[in-house]
């Protein structure tokens, strides 16, 4: 019997990383994206990691949602190509960067955003928590508090950026911004409902939910 070394179409490389500087992860994403633009048959990728404290602004983000002067700031801040307003990353927040070829899934950005929300909702359900979507907003809420932010960039139907789930972060950094430009809804973290929860245990459930929602077989790399 002749066996093919070609991976199945629904395989997805999983990179489980620890704490990674934002710009390093951003450059890595861009490299993976451009590889897949040039070679569309390459496998999908999911990167899971945490970042040191950093603020990021979407390409059209307004500076009015910063409560500090970005030109005279001790805080790391970057404007990037994703959609959405300002957000905050820090240890204790689990960040997922899917690099997916949507031609293999569905060429529909609204569908993709809802699928990312569904991943988070399924993770929360593992803990008996009901994650909510809100009309006209992107992300996932728990009892009125936003626990997951989502922002994406898609080039030639290849995705980058992704989701950030507040597991057990120090929430202080969120107080320096209006997260995602939403003035009337607070942010929250899973630790407020589940004391002692860690990113390490949540990773397992994120991987399982991501595989189920997107119909992928994740292979740790």
From Swiss-Prot:
It catalyses: octanoyl-[ACP] + L-lysyl-[protein] = N(6)-octanoyl-L-lysyl-[protein] + holo-[ACP] + H(+). Its EC number is 2.3.1.181. It comes from the Bacteria. One of its GO terms (biological process) is protein modification process. The active site is at 180 (acyl-thioester intermediate). Substrate binds at residues 82-89, 149-151, 162-164. InterPro entries: aa-tRNA-synth_II/BPL/LPL, BPL_LPL_catalytic, Octanoyltransferase, Octanoyltransferase_CS. Pathway: Protein modification; protein lipoylation via endogenous pathway; protein N(6)-(lipoyl)lysine from octanoyl-[acyl-carrier-protein]: step 1/2. The record marks 146 as: Lowers pKa of active site Cys. Residues 40-218 form the BPL/LPL catalytic domain. Its main location: cytoplasm. GO terms for cellular component: cytoplasm. It is found in: Cytoplasm. GO terms for molecular function: lipoyl(octanoyl) transferase activity. It holds the Pfam family LplA-B_cat. Keywords: Acyltransferase, Cytoplasm, Transferase. Belongs to the LipB family. PANTHER family: LIPOYLTRANSFERASE 2, MITOCHONDRIAL-RELATED (PTHR10993:SF7), OCTANOYLTRANSFERASE (PTHR10993). In the reaction, the free carboxyl group of octanoic acid is attached via an amide linkage to the epsilon-amino group of a specific lysine residue of lipoyl domains of lipoate-dependent enzymes. Catalyzes the transfer of endogenously produced octanoic acid from octanoyl-acyl-carrier-protein onto the lipoyl domains of lipoate-dependent enzymes. Lipoyl-ACP can also act as a substrate although octanoyl-ACP is likely to be the physiological substrate. This is Octanoyltransferase. It comes from Trichormus variabilis (strain ATCC 29413 / PCC 7937) (Anabaena variabilis). The lineage of its organism: Bacteria, Bacillati, Cyanobacteriota, Cyanophyceae, Nostocales. The gene is lipB.
């Amino acid at each position: 019997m002749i066996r093919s070394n070609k991976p199945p179409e629904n395989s997805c490389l999983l990179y489980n990383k620890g704490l990674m500087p934002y710009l390093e992860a951003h450059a890595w994403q861009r490299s993976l994206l451009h590889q897949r633009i040039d070679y569309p048959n390459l496998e999908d990728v999911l990167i899971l990691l945490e970042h040191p404290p950093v603020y990021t602004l979407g390409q059209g983000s307004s500076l009015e949602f910063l409560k500090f002067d970005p030109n005279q700031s001790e805080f790391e801040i970057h404007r990037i190509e994703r959609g959405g307003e300002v957000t905050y990353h820090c240890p204790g927040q689990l960040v997922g960067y899917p690099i997916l070829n949507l031609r293999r899934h569905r060429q529909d950005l609204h569908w993709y955003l809802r699928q990312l929300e569904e991943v988070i909702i399924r993770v929360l359900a593992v803990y008996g928590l009901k994650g909510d979507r809100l009309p006209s907003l992107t992300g996932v809420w728990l009892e009125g508090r936003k626990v997951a932010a989502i922002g994406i960039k898609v080039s030639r139907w290849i995705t980058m950026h992704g989701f950030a789930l507040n597991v057990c972060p120090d929430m202080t950094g969120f107080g320096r911004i209006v997260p995602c430009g939403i003035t009337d809804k607070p942010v929250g973290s899973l630790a407020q409902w589940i004391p002692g929860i860690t990113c390490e245990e949540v990773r397992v459930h994120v991987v399982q939910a991501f595989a189920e929602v997107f119909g992928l077989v994740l292979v740790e790399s």
